[in-house]
Regions:
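Short beta-strand scaffold segments in enzyme catalytic cores
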Residues: 14-19, 165-170
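Active-site-proximal beta-strand elements of phosphoester/diester hydrolases
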Residues: 2-7, 26-29, 153-159, 177-183, ...
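Short acidic-hydrophobic, aromatic-tinged amphipathic segments that line or gate anion-handling sites
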Residues: 129-142
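A short catalytic or substrate-binding loop motif that flags glycine-/basic-rich loops and adjacent residues
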Residues: 9-13, 148, 159-163
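Beta-strand-turn-beta hairpins that frame and shape the catalytic cleft
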Residues: 1-3, 21-25, 140-155, 172-178
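Cap/insert and terminal regions of metallo-dependent hydrolase folds
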Residues: 167, 185-218
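Pre-active-site segment of Zn-dependent metallo-hydrolases
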Residues: 9-14, 21-82, 86-92, 97-128, ...
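A generic structural signal for alpha->beta connector loops
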Residues: 81, 128-131, 151-153, 175
Length: 218
């Protein structure tokens, strides 16, 4: 198993991680940094291409915040065969928010407040949408890679963060289990219940740590 953070290790923004499990390559989120513009705002997807034995089969988008999905079009440009998995609510929000991001980038360039061309267009987003696959919470779905001889499955769990947000459990037929919480909260909100997590133990836990060193949060 290989884990590589592609962005947002010490700051909020550009959350994205590469996980290689049983020869299946999976991207966990593809966020953009809201404090940056142009290429500096996206994760370092080139780190994957520099390794000939690595391949991106699937991507998981845990929720529709810019710092977790804003670079999804760039990920698809880099790896055109990737299948993108998310909840239905995240898909519905992505269909609204990503085109809005494309329009904002175009407007900032026109107004002279951006030094870079837009990273993607609304037309590109429409072309990429056939790669989106939606799943219900606690519904098992296939994540096996084209080079893997060992099946890998995924399952979403309510993350308790925003509408549609989900953590994901990754399980291989060899018995290894990885859980990625993404942004999560145990406490219920006005319209969002608190997060749910797998009952059985996992081998690897990838846990968000926002406010993790805050005394009040502890």
């Amino acid at each position: 198993m290989i884990f590589l953070a592609l962005g947002a290790t010490e700051a909020i923004g550009a959350s994205s991680h590469f996980l290689k499990i049983e020869d299946t390559g999976i991207i966990l989120d593809a966020g953009a940094d809201p404090e940056q513009d142009g290429p500096a705002s996206i994760p370092e997807f080139d780190l994957i291409r520099k390794n000939p034995g690595w391949y991106v089969d699937h991507a998981i988008i845990t929720h529709a915040h810019h710092d977790h999905m804003g670079a999804l079009p760039l990920l698809i440009k880099s790896f055109p065969h990737v299948l993108v998995h998310m909840t239905r609510a995240t898909r519905d929000l992505a269909d609204l928010l990503l085109p809005a991001s494309a329009r904002l980038q175009r407007r900032k360039l026109k107004e002279g407040s951006a030094a870079f061309d837009p990273l993607f267009s609304e037309e590109e987003l429409e072309a990429y949408s056939y790669l989106y696959m939606t799943h219900e919470l606690e519904e098992e779905f296939d994540l096996s890679g084209v080079r893997s001889r060992v099946p890998v499955k995924g399952m979403f769990y309510n993350a308790g963060h925003v509408l549609g947000a989900a953590g994901v459990l990754l399980s291989s037929a060899n018995g290894s289990r990885v859980f990625y919480t993404s942004d999560t909260s145990l406490r219920p909100q006005a319209i969002i219940p608190g997060g749910d997590y797998p009952d059985e133990p996992v081998d690897v836990l990838i846990l968000e740590s926002t406010l993790g060193a805050d005394e009040e949060a502890e």
